[in-house]
Amino acid sequence: MAPLQPGDSFPANVVFSYIPPTGSLDLTVCGRPIEYNASEALAKGTSVLVAVPGAFTPTCQEKHVTGFIAKLDQLRQAGVDRVLFIASNDAFVMSAWGKANGIKDESILFLSDSDTAFSSSIGWANAGRTGRYAIVVKDGKVVYAAVDTVRGSTEKSGVDAVLTVLGNQGKL
């Protein structure tokens, strides 16, 4: 499959591994991974799927996830129903990353694309890891898809780029 473009349907059968929040920020409290059917979830409403190369890594932590957390209210005001972060880390690491960032509910989902199946399928995996990209989906249709190819850059996939797209398209 080629990279996603605005106007494309979000692919069918995209499933990630996910540990639902327990309400606790205790990193030693482990949930059990379940499947998260992204194709089904993204079929309704407005969603932002953000991929990062790795949880707890400098750019991913310092620029990417913290930006989306800080501007979550602005995303909601722009009509975003859900924010999903994916990385090639396993579901346990992704769950811990969410907790380490103070997320104890489903305001932002931390999902695992551990074998990079999805990222590879759209050509945005890099050396066994997920690439750094953002995809905005409204009612199952891609309205924005962009990948950052410059190391450390979040110019195309960061929260400000996403908010600009949402603002330029009205409230989608």
Curated annotation (Swiss-Prot):
In this chain the Thioredoxin domain maps to: 4-171
Alphabetized, the UniProt keywords read: Antioxidant, Cytoplasm, Disulfide bond, Isopeptide bond, Metal-binding, Oxidoreductase, Peroxidase, Redox-active center, Ubl conjugation, Zinc
Kindly list the places in or outside the cell where this protein is found, as annotated in its UniProt entry: Cytoplasm
Q: EC number(s) of the enzyme?
A: 1.11.1.24
Q: What residues sit in the active site?
A: C60 (cysteine sulfenic acid (-soh) intermediate)
* Family affiliation: Belongs to the peroxiredoxin family. Prx5 subfamily.
Q: How does it assemble?
A: Homodimer; disulfide-linked, upon oxidation.
One further remark on this entry is: The active site is a conserved redox-active cysteine residue, the peroxidatic cysteine (C(P)), which makes the nucleophilic attack on the peroxide substrate. The peroxide oxidizes the C(P)-SH to cysteine sulfenic acid (C(P)-SOH), which then reacts with another cysteine residue, the resolving cysteine (C(R)), to form a disulfide bridge. The disulfide is subsequently reduced by an appropriate electron donor to complete the catalytic cycle. In this typical 2-Cys Prx, C(R) is provided by the other dimeric subunit to form an intersubunit disulfide.
> Protein name, please?
Peroxiredoxin AHP1
